[in-house]
Regions:
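Long amphipathic N-terminal alpha/beta scaffold segment
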Residues: 94-96
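Short, acidic loop-to-helix structural element flanking the phosphoryl-transfer center
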Residues: 73-84, 89, 98, 105, ...
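Short, electropositive alpha-helical surface patch
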Residues: 63-76, 153
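Asp-based, Mg2+/Mn2+-dependent phosphohydrolase catalytic module
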Residues: 1-6, 38-50, 122, 126, ...
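Short, flexible, glycine-rich and Lys/Arg-enriched loop motifs at helix boundaries
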Residues: 16-27, 141-149
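Flexible, glycine- and charge-enriched loops at secondary-structure boundaries
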Residues: 22, 26-30, 76, 114, ...
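Short acidic alpha-helix initiation/capping motifs at coil-to-helix transition points
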Residues: 27-38, 76-85, 143
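Conserved phosphoryl-transfer catalytic core
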Residues: 11, 18-69
């Protein structure tokens, strides 16, 4: 069957996290939160040390709580919304909506510096773009949409994609099949069976399979907490993104 669409996961599929470790990942968020707090101090939204301590403690608690909840419910909690909820709980209201988005930008800014395309990513996308009538998209479980957009633009990769979808924008996370079907719609495609999804984990393969897509697992060396076994028959395995070229007909 002719493949009409190819959906890529972002992290550890198109991009790698430099010298990846769980500790480094969380350190990026700790630095990002400090940067966000500096912004809140500059704008006089947080104006004393006691409220800053309360804010920091509550934000970390909420972020962890919502992340664990999202794994169970598949509902996404965008970072900007977490900032809003924390400030509201501290009775700090009437904050400009743009501030919440800026705080999320700052929170993810250190993480953003660590993501770089795999060495074969751009070359593979260029070759795939030469396939007649093949549409491509990025689909990421990420709580801040602009992080993915910024990185695709930074490395001149936006031009290859007909759609960029994140759980932050859609409201649900992979493996919920709805986010895959929504991505197909954004690509202008109607038949899941003519589309492939390539990702590095359970959410990509199981979700893609439930939505009726063909699936490709991109093997990842680093293991994360919350890993789940993939109980899906007949998915393709690749060790490098360039191997996808062997499976597009």
């Amino acid at each position: 069957m002719k493949i009409e669409g190819l959906i890529f996961d972002f992290g550890f599929t198109l991009f790698e996290f430099k010298n990846a470790s769980v500790e480094k990942y969380f350190e990026c968020f700790r630095k990002g939160l400090r940067k966000s707090i500096e912004k809140l101090k500059e704008t006089n939204i947080l104006n004393n040390e006691e409220i800053i301590k309360q804010f920091s403690k509550l934000f970390n608690k909420k972020r962890s709580q919502y992340f664990k909840q999202s794994l169970k419910t598949k509902k996404e909690f965008p970072t900007s919304n977490v900032f809003e909820l924390v400030l509201e709980e501290l009775n700090i209201e009437k904050v400009n909506r743009e501030i919440y988005l800026e705080l999320a930008d700052l929170y993810h800014s250190y993480e953003e510096k660590e993501w770089v395309p795999f060495k074969n990513t751009k070359d593979t996308l260029e070759k795939l773009s030469n396939f007649k009538n093949l549409k491509m998209a990025v689909l990421s479980n990420h709580p801040h949409h602009m992080t993915i957009i910024n990185l695709l633009k930074k490395y001149d990769l936006m031009e290859f994609f007909n759609a960029v979808v994140t759980s932050a924008k859609f409201g649900k996370r992979k493996p919920d099949p709805d986010i895959f079907l929504y991505t197909l719609k954004k690509m202008g495609l109607e038949k899941p069976e003519t589309c492939m999804v390539c990702g590095d984990e359970h959410a990509d393969i199981v979700g893609g399979d439930k939505a009726g897509l063909q699936t490709i697992l991109c093997n990842r060396m680093l293991k994360f907490p919350f890993e789940r076994e993939i109980n899906v028959p007949n998915y393709i395995k690749v060790n490098d993104i360039s191997e996808i070229l062997n499976h597009i007909h």
